[in-house]
Each structure stands twice: as C-alpha cells, then as structure tokens.
Amino acid sequence: MKEIKKTMTKQMTARRDDTPLHTAVREGKTDLLLEMIGEHDGVELKELLAEQNQSGETALYVAAEYGYTDMVKILMKHSDSVLAGTKAKNGFDAFHIAAKNGNLQVLDVLIEANPELSFTFDSSKTTALHTAASQGHGEIVCFLLDKGVDLAAIARSNGKTALHSAARNGHTVIVKKLIEKKAGMVTRVDKKGQTALHMAVKGQNTEIVDVLMEADGSLINSADNKGNTPLHIAVRKNRAEIVQTVLKYCEVSRVAVNKSGETALDIAEKTGLHEIVPLLQKIGMQNARSIKPAEKVEPSGSSRKLKETVSEIGHEVHTQLEQTGRTRREIQGIAKRVNKMHTEGLNNAINSTTLVAILIATVAFAAIFNVPGQYTDDPKDVPPGYSLGEARAAPRPEFLIFVVFDSFALFISLAVVVVQTSVVVIERRAKKQMMAIINKLMWMACIMISVAFVSLSFVVVGEKEKPLAVGVTAIGALIMVSTLGTMCYWVIANRIEGSKSSPASMMSDPELADSKHNRKLYAV
C-alpha cells in the first residue's frame, strides 16, 4: 500500500511539474528545505524560490496551502514582497490560499512579515477577506478585520462585498462581525443593485435577515436594478421561511411593483408557489393589476439612494487613497531596485577597470625587460659603443619611442590601481565622477601601450619587412581612432541629453525622474 501511495505521489508530482523544492515542501520535509536553501544564496536563491510549477505555484504557495507554518517562516525570511505576492494560475497568492483554507497561523506569519499582503486580490478583485467570508472562516475574518485594515469596504469586480458573500452563504457570525466593523456596509449595492439583504433572502438563514434589518430597516423595500425588493427575490427563490421572516416587519411594502410590472404575489401565483401565496394574501398583498396607479410605488426611495451614493463615494475615495499609497510604495521599491542596479553596475565597472589597469601595468613592466635582440649581458662580448646591460636596440629611434610610451602606460595604470585600491567612495555621484576620470586615464594608457607596441614592431620586422610594420600601424590606428571617436561621440551625446532632460527632471518625482537615472551610459 505504501509503495502504491509513493508511486501515485511521484506521478502527481510529475504532472504538476514540481521542482525538488516544491516536493520537499509538499512532503513537509523541513530539514531538506533548509538544506536546499543553504546550498544557494543571493540571486540563485531568489531564482530558486521564484520557480513555479505547472499550476504557477511557488514553494511558498505550497507551504501556505498545506498549512506548514514553520516552512512559511523559513521561506518568508528569504522572500521579498514581489515573491510573496506571486500568483498561481488560479489567481491566488500564498496569503490568499491560506485564507481560503482557514490557516490562521500561516496568515499571521505572512502578514507579520509583509502587512501589504492583506491587500492582494485575484483576477476578479476578490480579497482574502472576501474569500474567507465566503468559506465561513470566522476566525480568519476577525483576524483580518482586527488588523485595522479596511478590507471590508473593498468590493469584487461585480460590486459584491464580503458582506454580500457572507449573507448569501448563511454565515451569521461573519455578517455580525462585518456590520460591527463597518455598519455602513449594509446599504452597499453590487452591480445588480442588490444589497446584502437581497443576497440573504436567496439563502435559508432567517437569522441573517433579522441581523441586517436590525442594522438598517430601510433595506426591506430596497430595489435592485430590475425593481425587485428582497421580498420579490425570496418569493422567486421559493424560500417560504424567509418570506415569513420578511413579512413580519411592518415596513414591508404591499404595493411594491418591479420593472416587469409584478408584485411578489404575481410572482408566487405565476410560478405556482401554493405555500407562499396564502402568506402574501394574509397581509393584504395584491396583484399589480388590482393596484390603482396612484398606489403603485417605486420600492427604493430617494433618501436611500442618496445614502447609497454617499456610501459608494466614500468607499471609492478610500479605495483610491489606499491604491495611491500602494502605488507610491511600489514606485519607491522600483526606484530602490533601479538604484541598486546602477550601484552594482558601477561597482562592476570599477572592478573591471582595476583588472584592466593591472593587466596593462603587468604587460608594460614585462615589455621593457623582454625587448627584441635582448641585452648586452656578456662582459666578454660587449659591442663597441654599448655598455653592459644596454638593450641592443637602444640606439634606434623606434626603441626610444617604445620606452617613453611604455613608461607612460605603466605609470598611468599604476596610478589607477593605487586610486582604486586606496579610495573608498560611498556616494554614487562621486563614484561616477571618479569612474569618468579613471576611464579617461585608461584611454590614455591603452593609447600609450598601443604606440609602444607599434614602435617595437618596426624593430621586430627589420628594414626589409618595414611595410609590414606600416600595415600594422595603419590597422591599429584605424581601430583605435574608430573606437575613441565613437566613445567621444557618446560622451558628447550623453552630456547633451543630460542637459536637455535636467529641467524636466526637476518637475517630476525625484525618486525616478532624475535624468541621470535614465541614462544608458555611465562614467564615459
């Protein structure tokens, strides 16, 4: 039996396209998880944690779904807000799936690590609070509401709030908690124009009807976009007990006609609801054709409409403020990441320049002691006019040019190495200024070492093959002039672009609009 179960697990894992990390989390192997995390760091670790299976689930999502609190704690230590908010293909992230499954401890860990996770929602704009309310997880709803976050006011894309869903699914405790937290929610309508009472009468929980009526008695005659009152809806759904509960309130209208020209009695008679018809007739409910035109009333009054409008405006303003705050935080986060990328780029450039400077210094130093023809190092064989240790090519003008330019290349490179290893610059602008100067010095060093190489090539090829050395000089000159010409063009273009964009940057967000942040070239 164990072997069969093991085989089934492997097959399911293969179908999910789980990574080893997913599998370790799914099987609850905390030690293996720690071992895998310990084998990676930095970018590699982030990539490991960000990997998704076929369903778009990250390892954090799986841990939250299964309710592995310890694993969630471990993973959150190495996860940023972007990774923690990664959504699976079902539109849920780790926080949302934990709320759906009623994992309170997991939610506590997630919201403590990143409070903004409570604002996450799926493709239909369903928040974790909404999902928890629909599922009847009272502890989760209380937990989210007690965090002081006004999630209760956020509606789904169809306009339904958490109160609508809780009322429809008959979760009395949750309805009470939501009303206690935000009493004005009872008048909120969805895109169909229906209140929470309209949703409650579709179910079978009479207690919720009483709770909502206690909160706001005017709901009894509120009409949706089709003119249906809660009584119309209850009759259409054949909810006899709900109809009895609604009829006990004296405020209920007996002459309410919907946009189809029907009273609740018309609907009951048309659909053959013999149990409900007597209940309606008992309170004096009439058919629409029996009601005099003067007696017909629109179920929703202007005062209720005004209240709903004010409530909706307040909700929209609050939502916009929350969205603005979140957007601002996201922009600041992006700016920080961009700044980090710029800093890393500068550091990489500094390290690369140091290596190149060391290389040029090494080559220049070695070249002076390895000239063609070597030196007069034999005391018994010193040519006339030479001294012991003198280079055999020393009298030639090409050698003189080589020595001068090779020395320049050596000492310029050494100067760059000394500056790079001695000066510690923290501020980014100062780093860029230093890199700009060092880059110019490296240009000079490259030119010097190139001239030294070309001059020495004349010595190497000899007089007979002098055209070959001339060809090498032409090729080198062409390449160096083209390269330096292009670099100079970039310098000028970059500075012109910076001068043009500076006035605009003063009028925008300093976090992102700094023209220097948007340049593609640095320290040229």
From Swiss-Prot:
The ANK repeat ranges on this chain: 16-45, 55-84, 90-119, 124-153, 158-187, 192-222, 226-255, 260-289
UniProt cross-references to InterPro entries, sorted A to Z: Ankyrin_rpt, Ankyrin_rpt-contain_sf, PGG_dom
Keywords (A to Z) from UniProt: ANK repeat, Membrane, Phosphoprotein, Repeat, Transmembrane, Transmembrane helix
Pfam families: Ank, Ank_2, PGG
Keyword Zinc-finger: no
Localisation: Membrane
UniProt GO cellular component terms: endoplasmic reticulum; plasma membrane
Membrane topology annotation: Multi-pass membrane protein
Modified residues (Phosphoserine): 508
Membrane spanning residue stretches: 349-369, 399-419, 441-461, 472-492
PROSITE patterns: ANK_REP_REGION (PS50297), ANK_REPEAT (PS50088)
Name of the protein in its database record: Ankyrin repeat-containing protein At5g02620
Source organism per UniProt: Arabidopsis thaliana
